[in-house]
């Protein structure tokens, strides 16, 4: 039995979970998320109000989807109650971020500014011109947008310049030895 998959999912007060066949919909104070559960996995509500994810057999596919499904539903419950946020920072001379409405405009050493549009469900918050955050209720979407922004100018291993996650340690390389 999957150690993660067999754990019950506690549903806090103010969160409504609807199970309609293979579709699981979670509504909370911050919004609504839905997920379609893969074929061999089933989700049931227990008497004490928690959710239990079960699998019919010990096939390899069932075992792999068991823990995954439980974690995805747990992330949905946490997302609609607390939400998710990724903090990023920019290091480098002349590198900065400015808010343009709901979008972000980056100056990252290119000959042109780079504009990142906020998709539905994602909000950007700019602390100062080198620190900002990506927030939303969908953990996967928040992480993907943050990774795409980081990919605009990955941290340089020699000088450390670029966009990085807050608190990320960049592995530095030694430059070539001069004579």
Swiss-Prot record:
Keyword set, alphabetical order: Ribonucleoprotein, Ribosomal protein, RNA-binding, rRNA-binding
Alphabetized Gene3D superfamilies for the sequence: Ribosomal protein L6, alpha-beta domain (3.90.930.12)
Biological processes, Gene Ontology terms: cytoplasmic translation
UniProt-recorded Gene Ontology molecular function terms: rRNA binding; structural constituent of ribosome
InterPro entries (UniProt xref): Ribosomal_uL6-like, Ribosomal_uL6-like_a/b-dom_sf, Ribosomal_uL6_a/b-dom, Ribosomal_uL6_bac-type, Ribosomal_uL6_CS
Pfam family, one: Ribosomal_L6
Keyword rRNA-binding recorded: yes
GO cellular component: cytosolic large ribosomal subunit
Transmembrane portions of the chain: none
Matches recorded under PROSITE patterns: RIBOSOMAL_L6_1
Protein's job: This protein binds to the 23S rRNA, and is important in its secondary structure. It is located near the subunit interface in the base of the L7/L12 stalk, and near the tRNA binding site of the peptidyltransferase center.
Assembly information from the UniProt record: Part of the 50S ribosomal subunit.
Family note: Belongs to the universal ribosomal protein uL6 family.
NCBIfam families found in the cross-reference section: L6_bact
Annotated protein name in UniProt: Large ribosomal subunit protein uL6
Gene source species: Kineococcus radiotolerans (strain ATCC BAA-149 / DSM 14245 / SRS30216)
Lineage, uppermost ranks: Bacteria, Bacillati, Actinomycetota, Actinomycetes, Kineosporiales
Name of the gene: rplF
């Amino acid at each position: 039995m999957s150690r993660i998959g067999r754990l019950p999912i506690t549903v806090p007060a103010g969160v409504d979970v609807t199970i309609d066949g293979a579709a699981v919909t979670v509504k909370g104070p911050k919004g609504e998320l839905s997920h379609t559960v893969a074929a061999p996995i089933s989700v049931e509500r227990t008497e004490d109000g928690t959710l239990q994810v079960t699998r019919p057999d010990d096939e390899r596919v069932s075992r792999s989807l068991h823990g995954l499904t439980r974690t995805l539903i747990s992330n949905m419950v946490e997302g609609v109650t607390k939400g998710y946020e990724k903090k990023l920072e920019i290091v480098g001379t002349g590198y900065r971020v400015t808010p343009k409405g709901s979008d972000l405009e980056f100056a990252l050493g290119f000959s042109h500014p780079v504009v990142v549009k906020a998709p539905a469900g994602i909000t950007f918050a700019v602390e100062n011109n080198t620190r900002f955050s990506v927030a939303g209720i969908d953990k996967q979407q928040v992480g993907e947008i943050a990774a795409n922004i980081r990919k605009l100018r990955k941290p340089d291993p020699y000088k450390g310049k670029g966009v990085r996650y807050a608190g990320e340690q960049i592995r530095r390389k030694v430059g070539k030895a001069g004579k």
